[in-house]
């Protein structure tokens, strides 16, 4: 009941929310669709979105390709370490948002802090990790063959979400500034992330002080 009627179709809690502070360039990666992930990983795939909370001057991220390439070229560029030459390099600013459907190659760049809302899944296929090694001293695993299977090798599509920041089957994301009234109706819970400032949250007859970095689960029907 706490999740709401719209969540009855999901077999597990539908989303995860995170704060990501990239002190270095993160790996270039892709997430599979539900169909592919269920068949090959026995898990769901992943669609996600980023909301940029802060960034260093001249920060950028990778978001899909800047032009369409073939599967053969994709594989070759992974092997010869020239993949970034054909990726869509996007300068970022505080307040920017990016919707990342499954199959979209992506990577957060150094000096960027984002709030991430994602489908509840851990399936990630890395294609490039800058030669870094893990705690065991060995290069971190890459998943090139599976990435070749699932990656859309075209520029990212443009999306119109109307008044929402992002919207898909798994989540709807809105940005609220200043005071606002109830959002958690009987259809769905609300995951509330405090991204700036401080204030008060009044829910179910209780008042809670909130500040930047806090997160709250508001049960369905709590107003």
Model-based region annotation:
Residues 31, 100-101:
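N-terminal intrinsically disordered, low-complexity, charge/repeat-rich segments that act as generic
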Residues 1-94, 109-192, 196-198, 202-204, ...:
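Active-site region of the double-stranded beta-helix
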Residues 216, 221-222:
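Extended, charged low-complexity segments
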């Amino acid at each position: 009941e706490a999740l709401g009627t719209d969540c009855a179709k999901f077999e597990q809690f539908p989303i995860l929310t995170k704060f990501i502070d990239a002190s270095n360039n993160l790996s270039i990666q892709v997430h599979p669709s539900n169909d592919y992930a269920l068949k090959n990983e026995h898990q769901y795939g992943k669609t996600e979105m980023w909301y940029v909370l802060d960034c260093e001057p001249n920060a950028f991220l990778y978001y899909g390709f800047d032009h369409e390439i073939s599967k053969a070229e994709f594989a070759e560029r992974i092997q010869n370490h020239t993949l970034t030459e054909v990726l869509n390099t996007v300068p970022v600013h505080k307040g920017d948002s990016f919707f990342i459907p499954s199959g979209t190659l992506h990577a957060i760049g150094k000096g960027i802090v984002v709030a991430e809302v994602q489908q509840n899944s851990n399936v990630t296929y890395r294609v490039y990790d800058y030669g870094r090694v893990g705690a065991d001293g060995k290069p971190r695993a890459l998943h090139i063959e599976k990435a070749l299977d699932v990656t859309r090798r075209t520029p990212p599509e443009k999306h119109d979400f109307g008044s929402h920041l992002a919207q898909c089957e798994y989540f709807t994301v809105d940005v609220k500034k200043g005071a606002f009234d109830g959002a958690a109706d009987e259809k769905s819970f609300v995951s509330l992330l405090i991204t700036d400032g401080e204030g008060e949250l009044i829910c179910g007859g209780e008042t809670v002080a909130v500040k930047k970095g806090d997160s709250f689960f508001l049960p369905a029907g709590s107003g």
